Amino acid sequence: LDEMTQHAWRASGFPPQRVLGMAGVLDTARFQALVGLTGVARADEVSAWALGSHGEEMVIPLSQATAGGRPLTELLPAAELAAIVDRARGSGAEVVGLLRSGSAFLAPGRCAADMVLAMAADSGEVMPAAVLADGSYGIRDVYVGLPARLGARGVRGIVELDLRPDELVALREAAERIRARLGALVS
């Protein structure tokens, strides 16, 4: 997704704030649903971010994840949280496997619509989106999933969360892997 979004931006001639991708909203919703299955809170009471890239390079900063206002790290054992993060990373493939033909389209469509509605309403809502990194998180000039404030003209800005060092490293590594794949596409 990140690579396709970067390619679309380059091909479009639009300013980068007008070109963004949707994966993080869906991945976040899937993580919230998985936490909800544990019984510690309803999915709509879970606050979390799916950043980085879609799939194995997804970064869910547990330092920022809460349920009912309480840190998830206080509500669930570390091993259970790690298993939930792993399942969230593979949930797209899991859905495709369950469908047996085709791919998920309802949930991704709903998440994309939520992003469009936030922009149409000029809401300033912060959502995870594939955006052109501007130096935030020490990442620059590559599309990667980051918290983005959305408005009528697209991305108003990138919001910097207070990530733990290991979470920041994982996010930067995801960006570098995206950059490497982009380089391989060009050569």
PLM feature segments, named:
Residues 12-18, 27-187:
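C-terminal substrate-binding/catalytic lobe of Rossmann-fold NAD(P)-dependent dehydrogenases
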